[in-house]
A protein has these predicted regions:
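N-terminal basic, amphipathic alpha-helical segments
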Residues: 1-134, 330, 340-347, 355-358, ...
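Hydrophobic residues at beta-strand termini and immediately following loops
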Residues: 114, 180, 224, 309, ...
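Conserved core of the PLP fold type I
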Residues: 133, 143-275, 286, 292-300, ...
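General small-molecule cofactor/ligand-binding pocket signal
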Residues: 178, 220-224, 307, 397, ...
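Proline-centered loop/turn at the N-terminus of a beta-strand
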Residues: 199, 242, 277, 305-307, ...
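Walker B catalytic acidic pair
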Residues: 281-282
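Catalytic cores of nucleotide-enabled group-transfer and carboxylate-activating enzymes in metabolic
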Residues: 295-296, 336, 354, 385
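Conserved core segment of the aminotransferase class I/II
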Residues: 302-372
Length: 472
């Protein structure tokens, strides 16, 4: 009987993950050609999943030519090694080999993918960015050939410091700013800097990758429950946490904006013991659509215990891997003393280009355009959803900050069944419960879905609304 582990399936639904697992086993020869697959009911019982999940997985495998159905008998594996079969199906040895590792990634064929954090082509300032790159090539030829300092090119760090002062009221020196290719890289540096003896915390529900980074670095961590106003401070004390990673401006995925009272409560917690720190992750704070930004923790911290982290991946595009962290003075001095042997992971060319883009005022203009763009996009999506029969079937939550909102669906289906049904219609969703670590708490978030809308086509929203309406 086929057996698979469903604990770490990422953003896939059960049916998609099951389909990928079976396909991989067929390609690698673990399931032999001509072998009969278990019946849908038997496999569902063995894996403790629904029959419809197995049915959808088998249907996808059959559609792609990996298995075939014999009436009143079941599903059998196609002989992929047979020359005749290869010619008829178009499968070459190269394709079979490349598929062995193709469990995730690649271009998807969804009509609407609400799990993607990519940026639409029309939202990126190509002409200005290209013009800036040309200017850098002409004006910085000597600088482009030099190795950058470990913390990054000083010109970009000064540009970021000026930007933070103007728009977040943060007074920082450029020497406190460390540039890196992605927050994952910067997080690994932080763990080395703060030490693995400290205990770190991960928000629950929260961003899965944070826990994976701590685990891969061998750091000790605990999950901290997120309340209606942010992390549970009493739990930080109970679990003897030293370092909390949080997103006060816009928690992902709940969308909670931490009120100023909770921010001061966290600052009170961090000052009570010596080896305590707050990592403030403001990954999409610039994209707050309504109201003025609430002050950052770093801007109201007087104890030097807040490490501020941000990225340009949300404001420019996901493939621009430029992030930065602002270290308190004491940690900055320790960084240069202990970790200055690390080379900056962002090229000089990218750093000077971004610095010039910011210094010219183009970044500020781009942010303003981007806010308007996403606000109009969000309004169009909500307009399509909140009319007709669908209006009584869903409830929209936390729609004012960032480029995602939550959607609660009134349905008799389980989450698994609803996700599979949507996937069969070309609509990819992620359940809020999938971001929760503890299975007994997931019921609280039943049938609430995280709707990332940065990469969806507004023209397809009427179709999406119609498909959701049809689900019982």
């Amino acid at each position: 009987m086929l057996t698979y582990n469903f604990e770490n399936i990422g953003s896939d639904t059960l049916y998609e993950y099951l389909y990928k697992c079976i396909k991989n086993d067929i390609i690698q020869g673990k399931i032999k050609s001509g072998e009969k697959l278990p019946s849908k009911r038997a496999l569902a019982k063995n894996l403790a999943i629904s029959v419809i999940t197995v049915e959808n997985a088998y249907g996808q495998l059959a559609a792609e030519g990996y298995i075939y159905s014999v009436p009143k008998s079941g599903f059998y594996v196609v002989d992929l090694r047979d020359d005749k079969m290869k010619n008829e199906s178009g499968l070459s040895e190269n394709r079979i080999y490349s598929n062995k590792l193709n469990l995730t990634g690649g271009k998807n064929g969804y009509i609407a993918d609400f799990t993607s954090n990519q940026t639409e082509q029309s939202a990126f300032p190509f002409s200005i960015w290209t013009k800036t790159m040309r200017a850098v090539m002409n004006d910085y030829q000597t600088e482009l050939m030099l190795n950058p300092p470990c913390g990054g090119v000083m010109e970009l760090r000064q540009s970021i410091a000026d930007y933070l002062k103007a728009f977040r009221n943060m007074t920082v020196r450029p020497e406190q700013i460390i540039i890196g290719a992605g927050t994952e890289y910067l997080s690994s540096l932080l763990i080395q800097l703060l030490g693995k003896k400290l205990k770190y915390s991960v928000e629950n529900p929260g961003y899965h990758k944070i826990a994976k980074i701590y685990r891969s670095m061998g750091a000790c961590y605990e999950y901290i429950e997120i309340e209606e106003d942010g992390p549970k401070v009493e739990e930080l004390e109970e679990k003897e946490i030293n370092v909390i990673h949080c997103s006060p401006s816009h928690h992902y995925p709940t969308g909670i904006v931490m009120p100023i009272s909770k921010r001061y409560e966290l600052l009170g917690w961090v000052t009570r013991k010596k080896d305590r720190y707050i990592i403030e992750d403001e990954y999409d704070s610039e994209l707050r659509l309504n109201g003025k930004p609430i002050p950052s923790l770093q801007s109201i911290d007087v104890s030097g215990k807040v490490i501020y982290m941000n990225t340009f991946s949300k404001t420019l595009c996901s493939t621009v891997r430029i992030s930065y962290m602002v270290l308190p003075d004491e940690l900055a001095e320790r960084f240069y003393r202990e970790l200055s042997f690390y080379s900056c992971t962002v090229s000089n060319f990218e750093q000077y280009t971004l610095a010039q883009f910011m210094n010219s005022g183009s970044f500020e203009k781009h942010i303003n355009r981007l806010r308007n763009y996403y606000q109009q996009k969000r309004d169009r999506i909500l307009e399509a959803f909140l009319q007709g029969a669908l209006k009584t079937k869903i409830k929209i939550l936390e729609e004012d900050a960032g480029v995602h909102f939550l959607m609660k669906v009134d349905t008799n289906l389980s989450e698994e069944e609803f996700l599979d049904k949507m996937k069969s219609k070309g609509i990819k969703l992620a359940a809020l419960s999938s971001y929760y670590h503890s299975s007994e708490k997931k019921k609280k978030y039943e049938n609430i879905y995280v709707m990332n809308y940065s990469f969806v086509d507004c023209e397809k929203m009427e179709y999406v609304a119609k498909m959701i309406t049809q689900v019982e």
